[in-house]
Amino acid sequence: MKVLLRNVEEIVTRAELEEALASGTQLRAYAGFEPSGSVHIGHLPIITELKELQQLGFHIIVLLADVHAYLNEKGDFERIRETAEYNRRCFAAAGLSEETEYILGSSFQLDAEYMLDLLQLATVTTEKRARRSMDELSRSKTDRKVSQMLYPLMQ
């Protein structure tokens, strides 16, 4: 439990976590990355946490958010997918096991059901809330593209 609580800001709820741990079922941990460039030292804290969870028996899922990278103008899909594969190889070299599950965002984010969910979310998200998220993501504060408005909804 100590490893799970280290560097954690909030647990909803601790009792549910303890129950899940006691259940004997394999728990899952998830992290998402936009494959938009080189893997760097900033990735290591998350990779280290994932490795520790993996050693505790968690099933690790890594989202390689290729659609996010495309919306954020990081290249065409071919280049982004090459970068995603590079990211996967780097994460494996950093110690994530072969059992790690890697998922490309495009494997589900282009489906009709996901798109309907995204559109429904757009109907209840205020422009102010979306802009707050966009400001954290976008380097260009002026003349942003509509695609950058979708990005926060997909977070």
Question: Language-model segments: what does each one mean?
Answer:
Residues 1-155:
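NTP-dependent nucleotidyl-transfer catalytic core
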